[in-house]
Amino acid sequence: NRGRRRTTGSTGGSTGPATSPTGGSTGGSSYGRTGRHDLILRLATVEDLSDLYMMLLVMHSGTVDGTSPVKSEKLTSVISDALHRGIVIVAEVDGKIVGSIGGMETSDWWSDKLYLADLWFFVYKEHRKSRAALTLVKSFLEIGRDANIKVKLGHIYSGDIDRKDNFYERLGMSKVGSLYMES
């Protein structure tokens, strides 16, 4: 069953992960819930690697010009690392992944204080009007709170920056900087 567990009710309450980000691997843990349209959130497993890989290629194809090309081995390694040492949550509808957020604990270069940072956050275009994006981010934030560490989320290399900023701000997050690159 790939770590799925259905519960009834809204997507607001958490069944909680089996481990915190500091507790090691979360692959195979039970972390599911249902909401509207049979949306299921669950922790990803290694069985999801190829679906996540294909999803992230779609995400990359929608970025602005000037984005570095995908190196297959590196992308596979990063996904595998996140599956084994980080947090990867997938949203499913009818047994198919429609979105995901993945991240790792890290620290700023000047500090030992850990925070949970996203490596990716993506929902397929045809599911962006669903609650998938909202429930993925809320679950990621909840995992950080449960582990008593801050969460930092970002979005770069994509259009529609203002809409994405507003999305994060509606979740109580504050914008803390910008990223610039040569044209």
Where are these regions (language model features)?
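A short beta-loop-alpha structural element at the N-terminal edge
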Residues: 39-54
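Conserved GNAT-fold acetyl-CoA-binding loop/helix
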Residues: 57-78
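A short helix-loop-beta-strand connector motif used in the catalytic cores of GNAT acetyltransferases and
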Residues: 78-90
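Conserved beta-strand in the GNAT
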Residues: 90, 96-105
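A conserved beta-turn-beta hairpin within the catalytic core of GNAT-like acetyltransferases
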Residues: 107-118, 176
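A short, internal acetyl-CoA/4′-phosphopantetheine-binding micro-motif in the GNAT/acyltransferase core
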Residues: 119-130
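Conserved acetyl-CoA-binding loop-helix of GNAT-fold acetyltransferases
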Residues: 129-142
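Conserved beta-strand-loop-alpha-helix junction that forms the acyl-donor binding cleft
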Residues: 152-164, 181-183
